[in-house]
């Protein structure tokens, strides 16, 4: 199984966001662009928490994505930017996992 690639550069984030293909929920903003491989960038806005907590939330999201990846629910060829909203942060890990799974199901439905 391949490793999940990550988006790191600001211009890569902006290129995906400027395409304006998005799924918006109460918990996440999810921008996506078709690609030859799966790649994801995670952003937690600076005003929501200090750096330690932002990194903690990013690790939780990455872990949930890794579980989805291992279960085979993420096999799409998209570049994705995931922006967490404030009410997503205090949720339990299981709830975060379910919200991410729901978004990827919607993305799969939008692909067709």
UniProtKB/Swiss-Prot annotation:
One of its GO terms (molecular function) is 3'-tRNA processing endoribonuclease activity. GO terms for biological process: tRNA 5'-leader removal. Keywords: Endonuclease, Hydrolase, Nuclease, RNA-binding, tRNA processing. Transmembrane segments: none annotated. GO terms for cellular component: ribonuclease P complex. Its EC number is 3.1.26.5. The keyword ATP-binding does not apply. The keyword Ribonucleoprotein does not apply. Belongs to the RnpA family. HAMAP family: RNase_P (MF_00227). This is Ribonuclease P protein component. It comes from Mesomycoplasma hyopneumoniae (strain 7448) (Mycoplasma hyopneumoniae).
